[in-house]
Amino acid sequence: MIGHSTQEKIEKLVQSCGCNLYDLLLLKENERSILRLYITKEVGVSLDDCAMVSDLISPLLDVEDPLAGEYFLEVSSPGIERPLKRPAHYQHALGELARIKFADKNEIEGEIEAADETSVKLKGEEPIPYSLIKKAQTFYRW
């Protein structure tokens, strides 16, 4: 687990590149430990942005060493179909389509019309408290 102090330092470095830290995940895939950073930018994230963030963060991670042992650092955009985990994610996705799943396995889809610190509202629906949401993500109707 990455400590709060290290995460704040990562966030400041990402912001110094003109980007925002969207999410930070520690995971294992095929026996490999991965530290995955998702970054966003108003005009879209380029490969150069990802490389710049990676180059800035690598020395910090060498000193802070958030994971015991070897790991891979990945920096990318969260993509067009991205998870919605925090109120800020919903607020930045206003006007986009979202799929929301509840603990009882029901789900709802719709355009995000409003979002605040406690709930999200899809067009034509009542506000949904975040506490009722098990999983949510934006989606694109192809």
Curated annotation (Swiss-Prot):
<dbReference type="InterPro" id="IPR028998">
    <property type="entry name" value="RimP_C"/>
</dbReference>
<dbReference type="GO" id="GO:0005829">
    <property type="term" value="C:cytosol"/>
</dbReference>
<comment type="similarity">
    <text>Belongs to the RimP family.</text>
</comment>
<protein>
    <recommendedName>
        <fullName>Ribosome maturation factor RimP</fullName>
    </recommendedName>
</protein>
<dbReference type="InterPro" id="IPR028989">
    <property type="entry name" value="RimP_N"/>
</dbReference>
<dbReference type="InterPro" id="IPR036847">
    <property type="entry name" value="RimP_C_sf"/>
</dbReference>
<dbReference type="GO" id="GO:0000028">
    <property type="term" value="P:ribosomal small subunit assembly"/>
</dbReference>
<dbReference type="InterPro" id="IPR003728">
    <property type="entry name" value="Ribosome_maturation_RimP"/>
</dbReference>
<dbReference type="Pfam" id="PF17384">
    <property type="entry name" value="DUF150_C"/>
</dbReference>
<dbReference type="GO" id="GO:0006412">
    <property type="term" value="P:translation"/>
</dbReference>
<dbReference type="InterPro" id="IPR035956">
    <property type="entry name" value="RimP_N_sf"/>
</dbReference>
<keyword id="KW-0690">Ribosome biogenesis</keyword>
<keyword id="KW-0963">Cytoplasm</keyword>
<comment type="function">
    <text>Required for maturation of 30S ribosomal subunits.</text>
</comment>
<dbReference type="Pfam" id="PF02576">
    <property type="entry name" value="RimP_N"/>
</dbReference>
